[in-house]
UniProtKB/Swiss-Prot annotation:
PANTHER family: THYMIDYLATE KINASE (PTHR10344:SF1). Catalyzes the conversion of dTMP to dTDP. This is Thymidylate kinase. Its EC number is 2.7.4.9.
């Protein structure tokens, strides 16, 4: 399939309560309003058997060791990826609310080895564009429903932020378009910036892999 016909793979990352999920939905709605084919994928996908186990963990209903939950997060991405490939090949732009970068950033924040955290996701498709919504963890902590899940603690989020900054540096050196936006701007302004970035992204004929 030519690069003109395949869909784009767009990832939006961010700290918890950064407005990421809202922006993902706004982007999908915008693309559809422009008569483009678009679909939203949220990770973790809490509807699968693996995703339900992750959901229990995040809500602190069960305890799992850090290596186990990291591998479950990765498996949750792998179990969906074939369908994502199929959609992209049909010309559907796939918008991902979190991806492998979150897995690395959060697990490394708990002290797991950096390269080990990256290894389970090697072979997943490399996005055409990654957008990181940057917000001060202390501001995110003031937003509604903050603290309902395991990782929503300021100290943890500060470590995750540093890891995202490291990921951006590493992957940009590998040629990945990895852009940071200030998520403290208005919802409309952030949305407008995201739409501009997505509209102008350069795509290769086929997706590379991580």
């Amino acid at each position: 399939m030519s690069k003109q016909n395949r869909g784009r793979l767009i990832v939006i990352e961010g700290l918890d309560r950064s407005g990421k999920s809202t922006q993902c939905q706004l982007l999908v709605d915008k693309l559809i309003s422009q008569h483009e084919k678009a679909e939203l994928f949220k990770f973790p996908d809490r509807t699968t058997a693996i995703g339900k186990k992750i959901d229990d963990y995040l809500k602190e209903s069960v305890q799992l060791n850090d290596q186990v939950i990291h591998l479950l997060f990765s498996a949750n991405r792998w179990e969906t990826i074939q369908y994502i490939y199929e959609q992209i090949n049909k010309g559907v732009t796939c918008i991902l609310d979190r991806y492998a970068f979150s897995g690395i950033a959060f697990s490394a924040a708990k002290g797991l080895d950096w390269e080990w955290c990256k290894s389970p996701d090697r072979g997943l498709p490399r996005p055409d564009l990654v957008i990181f919504l940057n917000v001060d963890p202390r501001i995110a902590a003031t937003r509604g429903q903050y603290g309902e899940e395991r990782y929503e603690k300021i100290e943890m989020q500060e470590k995750v932020l540093k890891n995202f900054q490291r990921l951006q540096k590493e992957f940009r050196e590998e040629g990945l378009e990895f852009i940071t936006l200030d998520a403290s701007s208005s919802l409309e302004d952030v949305h407008s910036q995201i739409v501009d970035l997505v509209s102008n992204v350069n795509i290769h004929e086929t997706l590379d892999v991580l």
